[in-house]
Structure formats: structure tokens, C-alpha cells
Amino acid sequence: RNGKEYPTSTDYFIPSGKYAPLFTKAFGPTPSTIQIVFPDNSPEKVCAERYEYRDDAGGLVAYGDGQTFNVWNGQKYVSYTIADYPELMAGIARKYPNRAVRAGFDGWNVILTLTFVIPSVRGVAGVWTFTTKGASSSIPQVRNTFDAILEEKGFVRGIIFDLNVKFATSQKPNNNSRYPVVSL
């Protein structure tokens, strides 16, 4: 109505980039399941979680893996560890309160990035990435499956996984919102 477009959630994967037409040729325009293969067994390379803290203008104040964080000091990023500074994350939120902190949350975003090969996509050799911020839905689903297979078998490299997306409905009272959940 006002001419603005807003992002909408989908229950299918949307490829982007130079090789998107090859993805669409392999899976069609609205695939809800794709087969992927991890090229490495190292979680930090193929199933990496990152914590980010941004100010209200979108500036990246701090980021890290949950143990080591890089914090902007006004001129450069300086590395700190949770082992040395156990209250580091809360301290950053106190020093740089953003909208989320003012609304009663911790202000941090958790981002999961998967790096994988899609065997069905012919004509390109390389890895694809998928990123999600679904901290209480998609991230635990994917991470728990990845960790369980890695623990059970000792490796994930070369195993064909189904990466799925489907809508879930909120279980909160008086909230019938739908959101996509990705699972492995």
C-alpha cells in the first residue's frame, strides 16, 4: 500500500548468486528439501555458530564464537576471551545498549552458517553457504543433528544429508504466527 516491500518468510529455499539458475534447474523453483554433503569434519568450517552484537545503527560492536570475542574499541577489534572475562557478553550489552537490550533481551544475535556441497547441482564445483538466525528453532535443530552424527560416526564429511525447511506455528498463547524452521 505504501510502495514498500518487506521480506517474507518462505517454506522453500531461494538460491542467490551467479549459480542460482543451476540450483533451480536441479531442484525446481520451490524446493523444501535439498541434499547436501559437508566437505569437512570440522564444525568451525562447515557448521559454525557466530555471536554478533550490533548497535542501533547496525554497526558491528563485537563478534565471536562463544569463547573468544573481537570487540571494537573505536579504532580496531581487540580479542577477549570468556575465560579471562566471564561477564564479557553482559558487559558489552551494558556499555552499548541496543534496542533489544532496552526491550529486556540480551542484545546478541546467534548466526549459524553451513558450508556444503550440493551434489545434484551440476556444472559447478564449489561450496554453497546457508545462514540462519533462528536461535530457538532452526539453529538447535541443525546443530543437534550435526553434533549427534559427528559424535556417533566420528565424521560428517561425505554423508548425504537432507536439509529441510517447513513452516512451524508459534506455541505462544494468542500468537498464531508462522515461521520457517530449517532442519538437517
Predicted ranges, named:
Residues 101-184:
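Extended serine/threonine-enriched, polar tracts that run as long, contiguous segments within proteins
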